[in-house]
Amino acid sequence: MSSTDKEISASEHFDNSISASTVDQVSELGPAGLSGAQVALLALILGGLLGIAGLTSLCLMVWFSHQRFGVDRSAKHGISVKDTSRMGGVAIALFLVIVWLGTAVYPALSGETKPDISWGPSFLVPAALLACVGFLDDLGVPLTPVTRLLITTLILTVGFFLVPAWMPNQLFELIGGTSLGFEVGLLIVSVFTCVGFINAGNMADGANGLFSGICLAFFVSAWFLTTDNFYFTISLGLLSFFLINVLTGRIIMGDFGAYGLSALIALVGFDIFDQGLVGLGFLATLLSYPCVEIIRIFLVRIGKGESPFRADNQHSHNLLNEYFSNLVKSKTLANSLTGVSIAAFSVMPAVVILFQKGQLNEMLCGLVFGVQCLVFVLVHTVTNAFKSKHQDAFTR
């Protein structure tokens, strides 16, 4: 989660009364982690759905949920209601490493006949480097927004310069030029798109199941289109995390996962677009919420003369969470309802389009994306009005 999602809402004003000394005392303890009953239930679900892969990912996330490092304190965040582990992204990465080692030793696991240590796309390298930038914040070594921006821009610029194939080169055909100026422009557009989506994904990691649900739909779609085992494996890890995150709220993606997965989504998007498997409109539809929300935030803040990196609690998922919190007693349930509902509306139209083989129909996808934009703006307007009315009633 970015600092933008870490402000305390008015409806949870009581947390403001927690003194700094109290927070320091609490920080010496680890998070509560998953209980025995939760682990047993999840073992039945994940074991039944995913077999040994589900149980492996569950073991990793249970272990991380009990560790003292990388903890997100509920006393410091508006949407979080309990101390949670920020190591969800790390657990998914370790799951991928375990699967990679397993298939290298036993190639039959992946349907191969001989060992092969190469696995996954080459742009895993820059995605991993970008994930490490976010990992510093997970460990309590935060970087300033400007420093993060400079580091991510540098990593992507160097990567695209060294390996131009990582960029969406099919844009040359759309634009109709291959000169040096076009190549420089493509580099700038590629870096800007990746940096923008990394920030969008980091912002969206603010409600249970929101970002992970979008990631899951994206990589399932990528696997459906390419039949690449890597995308299938990462989908398994994401499905395990999604269920654990939504049902318990005890572990979140963290900046390692948000940065790494956002970068990977952007780079995979470039790749499948270059292969002619999807259109730009389909990608916009599939990733609609983080893209629309980050653009809305920047436009609103710049229009007000404020820094676009300033932390506040005016994201649509924060406002919708406050609305659900007034409907249900369980704060974890309200959090999960927020994330799952937004993620479902963001990805389901694209999934339906994909199954109908319309992912190259730019007019259809553009129309659907336009409707999604209108709905997201409407939801933000309604929930913001509800928050203002609720605050007025509270202050009387």
Language-model-derived ranges and their functions:
Residues 126-141, 358-396:
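Alpha-helical transmembrane segments and their immediate juxtamembrane interface regions
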Residues 95-104, 337-358:
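Alpha-helical transmembrane segments and their membrane-interface junctions
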Residues 1-15:
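N-terminal acidic, proline/glycine-rich, low-complexity intrinsically disordered segments
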Residues 83, 144-147, 181-182, 254, ...:
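Membrane-interface starts of transmembrane alpha-helices
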Residues 292-304, 378-387:
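Membrane-helix cytosolic exit motif
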